[in-house]
Amino acid sequence: MIEVNNLVKRYGDHTAVDHLSFKIEKGKIYGFLGPNGAGKSTTMNMITGYIASTEGTVTIDGHDILDEPEQAKKCIGYLPEMPPLYFDMTVLEYMNFVADLKKIPKDKKKSMVAEVMEMVKITDMKNRLIKNLSKGYRQRVGLAQAILGYPEVIILDEPT
């Protein structure tokens, strides 16, 4: 499902990730463990295409994240440590916006958004502005956007 080969990320003279290689199989759960500054979030950001690697490759379901980003990203749902939420949108507006970004077909959008919102128990918050939600509800909105479209892989960075 995911293959990482000789992944490197350098920021000037600092090497954040140094020749990392691994494979992630479908249907299994994996985790990165390490101290602060070990490169866990940087690795996840490279896997998801948020930042480019200095060297190495990331392939998701046969698609290189840099050469075929749209195809690769269709396979991934990503919840970064700080979810990219728009505070001046309601929960429902935001979820519809994400559905459009993910190119969810119009005939499935309404039902899929409703289903995902119910899964993470935010349906009652759908008309509230995101800026007025508690941190816990904001995290749920972030999780909902990650699983919208039912991607094959969900990547969670500091999901608690």
Protein language model features and the residues they cover:
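Walker A (P-loop) phosphate-binding loop of ABC-type ATPase nucleotide-binding domains
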Residues: 35-39
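Catalytic Walker B motif of ABC-type/P-loop ATPase nucleotide-binding domains
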Residues: 154-157
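Conserved ABC ATPase signature
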Residues: 129-133
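Conserved ABC transporter NBD signature motif
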Residues: 56-67, 71-72, 76
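Conserved catalytic motifs of ABC-family nucleotide-binding domains
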Residues: 150
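Conserved ABC ATPase "signature" region
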Residues: 96, 100, 107-125
